[in-house]
């Protein structure tokens, strides 16, 4: 069964780093959303597939998403052809809707290089479809883009990933480090009072924290640590205004002493994913230190390289697990 992942970044440079990092990509395509965003779809393959004869479905082994998030595998209902008995399912297109997505069968067809004997076509088993979307800067733009992608997708997603670069909290997250969120926190969604900051929970207006499935967070972090660079699991703060002073950095660190990184989109992505019942994880590559704004000290190129490496690791491990 193909794992389907939606990766949401803020800007095109981040989306390109994610796409460039994906390994084993057999086909790429693009589709336009009504919101004006473009989703690029990458089908990752493992090798030549052998299609088994149709049989009545039985309990399936857990998919990667189920294994990582603790979801129980389901017993699929038989198709009309399977219910009709032997011979009825000989035509593989009999039960497929006319507009079915090519990746829905779990197979992708690619054309092999031309040889002396002419071009050959080989069927490759699709292990994952990774859709990448640059949704815009800030939690509102990210939420709109993610919700639109989820609503208009030709297939249901198993996982949503908020990914990009961000600021790191010293000394936990040095430049170039990867941070995997064990909590996605809307750090400025609340109210300032003479007695201090109040979260929306304390105000009675909703939530400011999303907690990714712990098993998923741990598996992603393990895969990223295999890249050899620094990687930590910690809360990632979502803010609408990037921190640019020592005083604000100190205030955030005091309220969130375990914080690893600051970015602007994670909570918006998580809100949209939660509305559709899809698990979410956030990954940030550190480009600068949270604190006084000093563009000369930023290392955006190195952070994008780390992001590229992160998705190289994920596309060869977590996205391919059975």
Where are these regions (language model features)?
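Short loop/turn motifs at secondary-structure junctions
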Residues: 156, 174, 232, 258, ...
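Generic non-transmembrane alpha-helical segments
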Residues: 21, 25, 215-230, 272, ...
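Active-site rim beta-loop-alpha module in soluble metabolic enzymes
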Residues: 196-257, 268, 276
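Threonine-centered tandem repeat motifs in low-complexity domains
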Residues: 40, 45, 49-59, 63-64, ...
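Active-site-adjacent mobile loop/cap segments within catalytic or ligand-binding domains
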Residues: 247, 252-263, 267-301
